Curated annotation (Swiss-Prot):
Gene assigned in the entry: waaF
Gene3D superfamilies assigned to the protein according to its UniProt record, in alphabetical order: Glycogen Phosphorylase B
MF (Gene Ontology): ADP-heptose-lipopolysaccharide heptosyltransferase activity
Family: Belongs to the glycosyltransferase 9 family.
The species this protein was found in: Salmonella typhimurium (strain LT2 / SGSC1412 / ATCC 700720)
Upper classification of the organism: Bacteria, Pseudomonadati, Pseudomonadota, Gammaproteobacteria, Enterobacterales
UniProt keywords, alphabetically: Glycosyltransferase, Lipopolysaccharide biosynthesis, Transferase
Name of the protein described by the UniProt record: Lipopolysaccharide heptosyltransferase 2
Amino acid sequence: MKILVIGPSWVGDMMMSQSLYRTLKARYPQAIIDVMAPAWCRPLLSRMPEVNEAIPMPLGHGALEIGERRRLGHSLREKRYDRAWVLPNSFKSALIPFFANIPHRTGWRGEMRYGLLNDARVLDKDAWPLMVERYVALAYDKGVMRAAKDLPQPLLWPQLQVSEGEKSLMCSDFSLSSERPLIGFCPGAEFGPAKRWPHYHYAELAKQLINEGYQVVLFGSAKDHEAGNEILAALNSEQQAWCRNLAGETQLEQAVILIAACKAIVTNDSGLMHVAAALDRPLVALYGPSSPDFTPPLSHKARVIRLITGYHKVRKGDTAQGYHQSLIDITPQRVLEELHSLLSEEGV
């Protein structure tokens, strides 16, 4: 069976979608699974053994461009896919499998996709509270799984593999000392500072970890580089020697390998959190207005700290310097205690 998956467009969602690929491969061992997704996803997809080919999606996240989608679909006809799974809920994401004449097209109904999907499922959000459960449910025939409790357990969580040789080579390429173990920070998050633990808390945690004999590495995109510099600026010159701001300095492939080399990760609710979880790194995940009830880190080595419940829209007055009060209230000492507990369990 040849399968085409139209994959998500965000790092975290792409990582969670691996649970679907793993489940499909477990159910259909001979299946060949190709995933169409933005080109930046290739470093993630290339480390998923279930995925045969990563097909770059040349269209932007918001672009309809129906003519180009028709052309893309027609170009895929020669591959003769038997089935398609469409993971985004948008109307446009279902067009390419339709134009590719793939006979069986599965996905949640989403934006009125009658006809485009001929196996459209109606989502009961209460029955499927976790995004990963919604992905995995699509691997089963319609009506077989009526709620998350019906899914075979344990779920096949995302897993990325990185070799020891890759880690040592990448650390050398970035001139990271082998004298001290690495702790990674992921201080960025999409949609601005409201989902971020304050930089001054990260700085205080970095000081304590450096004084304990660790070195700290900051990961993220170019948008997070300034936040990384704010963390660095709060350290004295001796401490700065053991803290590297690599936000915006690495490609995604390099960041994956370096995160794998870390003894532990401290992270906001972000895509890199899901990467760290898939790499089986001990991690402390810090949540504020966004909720771990929908997209938690999928790892037995993850500790979630959140001081509020439910989902909160951010309003003016809720934040200081853009930070949400519930994240301001998470103390560096609390995070350090969780880190120490995780590291002791790992024998570090």
